[in-house]
Regions:
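Chalcogenol-based redox active-site neighborhoods
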Residues: 1-167
Length: 167
């Protein structure tokens, strides 16, 4: 087995890149686009799938930390290739109060645009992006699929946005 087959994490979009706009469903009757949040920071949390233990813990942590994200006026969007109905059941079961977006059809299109799609598995990487108010990638992180990346990196990136905006 080669190292490439053991660790095939994606190379996310570079810092300074304009974040690709997208429109994905959050419910059967509502779609969310990145551009609707222009003027405020956005956190994109790509995750492999609803119901897995690590994804469940990661999303529960973000629900707990949501008030901290909101102090920076940041919007949190969870994204996986699961369908809307799976997301709705998962959010209800886990008491999640932020949008979970279905990158379902065409499967992984947004994850591919952000260079975090795992084609062999048909899921996205466990990847995080912080996008500034102008729609520019300011921070990204790809975690091993079995590792919860936590929220510290996100909070540091949001703090840095605030410092950049103040100077």
């Amino acid at each position: 087995m080669t190292n490439a087959s053991v660790d095939h994490r994606a190379t996310p979009l570079p810092v300074g890149t304009e974040a690709p706009d997208f429109e994905l469903p959050s419910t059967p009757d509502h779609k969310v686009s990145l551009s609707e949040f222009r003027g405020q920071p956005v956190i994109l949390a790509f995750y492999p799938g609803d119901w897995s233990p690590v994804c469940s813990d990661q999303m529960a942590l973000y629900q707990e930390v949501l008030p901290e994200f909101r102090k920076f006026n940041a919007e949190l969007l969870g994204i996986s290739v699961d369908g809307i109905w799976s997301h709705l059941a998962f959010a209800k079961d886990r008491n999640l109060h932020f949008p979970l977006l279905a990158d379902f059809e065409p499967k992984g299109e947004v994850a591919r645009a952000y260079r975090v799609y795992r084609g062999k598995e048909g899921t996205s990487e466990r990847a995080l992006y912080v996008i500034d108010a102008e729609g520019i990638v300011r921070w990204s992180h790809v975690s091993p699929v079995g590792v919860n990346p936590g929220a510290d990196g996100i909070l540091s990136a949001l703090e840095n946005l605030g410092k950049e905006g103040a100077s």
